[in-house]
Design a protein with these regions (language model features):
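Short beta-strand-centered segments at strand-helix junctions
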Residues: 41-43, 48-89, 95-142, 147-174, ...
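C-terminal edge-of-domain segments
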Residues: 224-227
Length: 227
């Protein structure tokens, strides 16, 4: 039965395991005099696509909108039922890449390093939304095709947090932190996590699939977020 599961289904299961395991993990932060303790979650962000409203209609038909399949950890964000095929310059493709909502002003594709090798795309490491001078690709949907002139990136590892989390860790928006993952006697350290602070945001680290697999995140016994 396990052999019939596709990669995205497996990654979804892994993310759920990670949520449950690290929901009460030691955050590694300094004690807070107000009694607030950050609730650290570390997530594997699988390959995905963000679309503009116009590109949704091109790919799925006039008047089409994204259909929510599952809420993501951050409030207001969701995995859509819709998927697209991503085609690279070598005519190699990644079928059924999940779309995340809501829509954005500009479409972008976030892939792991190994995905880029497979497609023949030399992707820069960028913060989400920083798309200037990035490579493009072709997106294929059931009703049409979109040729992106830019927008394919390897998302920079980062940590989302709210104002109370930032105060507890002693960091500010756009600063850098370190994540330490303890798994099976092998500790992996990820440096230069970009801090992204916003109101109403839950504390969550995003790693891509290559990074999560390298650290054996699924079997981690402890994670620490360090200033």
């Amino acid at each position: 039965m396990a052999g019939t599961l596709d990669r995205q289904t497996i990654e979804s299961i892994v993310r759920q395991i990670v949520y449950e395991r690290f929901a009460s993990s030691d955050c590694g932060c300094a004690p807070d005099s107000g009694g607030y303790k950050p609730n650290l979650v570390v997530s594997i962000s699988a390959r995905h696509v963000h679309l503009s409203d116009a590109d949704v209609e091109t790919l799925f038909g006039k008047g089409a909108t994204l259909t929510k399949m599952k809420d993501l950890y951050q409030d207001g964000f969701f995995a859509a039922e819709e998927t697209v095929m991503v085609v690279g310059p070598r005519k190699r493709m990644l079928p059924s890449v999940r779309i995340l909502g809501p829509t954005r002003p500009a479409s972008q594709v976030e892939l792991a390093f190994t995905d880029g090798i497979s497609l023949g795309i030399d992707m820069p490491v960028r913060e989400s939304g920083n798309l200037a001078n990035t490579p493009g690709c072709v997106l294929v949907g059931p009703k049409g095709v979109v040729e992106l002139k830019q927008g394919v990136i390897r998302a920079e590892r980062h940590v989302h947090m709210g104002p109370l989390d930032a105060e507890s860790y002693g960091v500010k928006d756009k600063e850098r932190m370190t994540l330490r993952v303890h798994a099976n006697g092998c500790t992996t350290t990820f440096e230069n996590l970009l801090v992204r602070v916003g109101k109403g945001i839950k504390l969550e680290v995003h790693l891509d699939t290559d990074e999560g697999n390298a650290a054996d995140l699924e079997h981690a016994s402890k994670v620490e977020l360090i200033k």
